[in-house]
Amino acid sequence: MHQQVKNSNYVNFQHHLNGLEIQREKLMKKKIYLIFLIILCCLCITGCEKSQDKNSIVMEDINAFRNYFENGYVFYDEINRKATINFDSKKILREYNKNFTWRKKKGLEKNCINGINQDALLVPLWNFLYDLDIKDGHLGIRTFERNWKLSKQESVYSSEYFFEKKNGNYYLLESPQKNLIGKKYTGNISDLKKIIKNNQELYFFGPSLTDGKEYEILALERKNYKVPISLIDSAFNDKAILRLVETDDSLYIRAGSFNIIKGSDEEQLFMREINKIPALEQGKKYIVLDLRGNSGGYTYYPKELVAAIYNRRKSEKQREDLWRFLNKADMGCVELQSSIIAQRKYETNIKNHQSDEIIESSRLEAENQKNNNKRYYIGLENIAPNKLPQDTGQRIDATLVILIDYYTASNAEHCIGYLYMMNKNNIILVGQNSSGTLISGNPIQYELPNSKLIVSFASTSYKNTVLLQCIEQWKGETYGFYPDYWCTETNVSETVGFITHDKKLIEQIDF
């Protein structure tokens, strides 16, 4: 009996121990589950914090972009007057995150700086500016790999349809479709471009377009014909800063760039060569100035080149008088001033190794503007005359033939304007239409703090200057200067030869 009770107590005790073990296991599972929940929450919080950190970094760049745009772009107020600018930072952030996710799925994660994908941010910022419908060749955004311009350049397309002019009308002279020869042109006259072909003046059907096309409508006798067209290729690639070639009758001047740093070897070469021009041009019938591929640069160099061509560098006074006259080209320009612009100009002058005088002047300007948050404009009273000023000083006997193409831009186009002011009746433009980037100037580049995207905002407006209002060959921003004789990539030599009759020049220069 005693043994049975003992066994029973043992069994009960064992059950009790088992119950405690089960409770302990349940408690342990609860603890593990609770720990798991805590870890999961921590991970979620960390993930949210990381997401918030990423968003805040992107938002910092978006706000910096807005600050530069509002305080560093000369046309900001003008655009805002036409239609209220709706800068939606949250929308741009959403578009960035959407682009980032898409690029990550596609494996396009390069160009990431500080966790920000440059391309994913570039797109919504570019779209914002593009929607404002601004025609400004200096406006753009740049990553490490690409430079996006806001304005689409007007490019002239060529065709195999050539016309001759008779009694004010144009008749088809050459055509792949022989049955059309002799028919009268009834389309837009501006689509016919003068060209030298087979040593005679003809006109080719060459529409001006912003988007690529393979066909266009040609109107003959009020009937429409779909004809093939192709973009004129500007393949000229001479990078010479300044090069001179002389023949008995002509002086060829190749000016490949005005983007020359003060004190550099390029500046020494440029100044050394232009000093030779006055002597070399004596007795010449033609001066051929080749500005193809010249994307511009500093205003100083085209003015010095013009002074050399017109031999106005004999004395400092003569040179200063000419500069004073050429400055009339900018009458009507408006310049934006702000603390952001002043500081960036100072930094740029240091980076470009400008003279101590220029650097100190810009430093003082930045210091004066430092605590001034106001934006203001200068030059508003500087009204442009209603006709192009003409130089009354010593002229040159030679005819000036200027070669241009799609890549002749900015201060290279200013150079053309200066030469028209010297003698507008003494110039023949040859080539393709120039870039058409003259409506603004002094573009300042700003780096966004995290993504390192570069945005370019012009601080000076030339919209109402004498150059853009009074030169007939200037057709507007994105159109540029239209040449008197158009060239394809194959007939530049023929055209220059037709004008100059200088066989030696054609033999020496690979146009």
Where are these regions (language model features)?
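Sec-dependent N-terminal signal peptides
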Residues: 32-43
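C-terminal motif of bacterial Sec signal peptides marking the signal peptidase cleavage site
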Residues: 46-47
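Flexible, low-complexity junctional segments that flank or bridge functional domains
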Residues: 50-322, 399-401, 426, 431-433, ...
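Short, Lys/Arg-enriched N-terminal segments with co-localized hydrophobic residues
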Residues: 15-27
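Short hydrophobic targeting helices and cationic amphipathic motifs
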Residues: 3, 10-17
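Positively charged n-region of N-terminal signal peptides that target proteins for export
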Residues: 24-31, 290
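Glycine- and acidic-residue-enriched helix-capping/beta->alpha junction motif
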Residues: 281-382, 420
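Low-complexity, Gly/Ser/Thr/Pro-rich intrinsically disordered linker/tail segments
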Residues: 465, 469-511
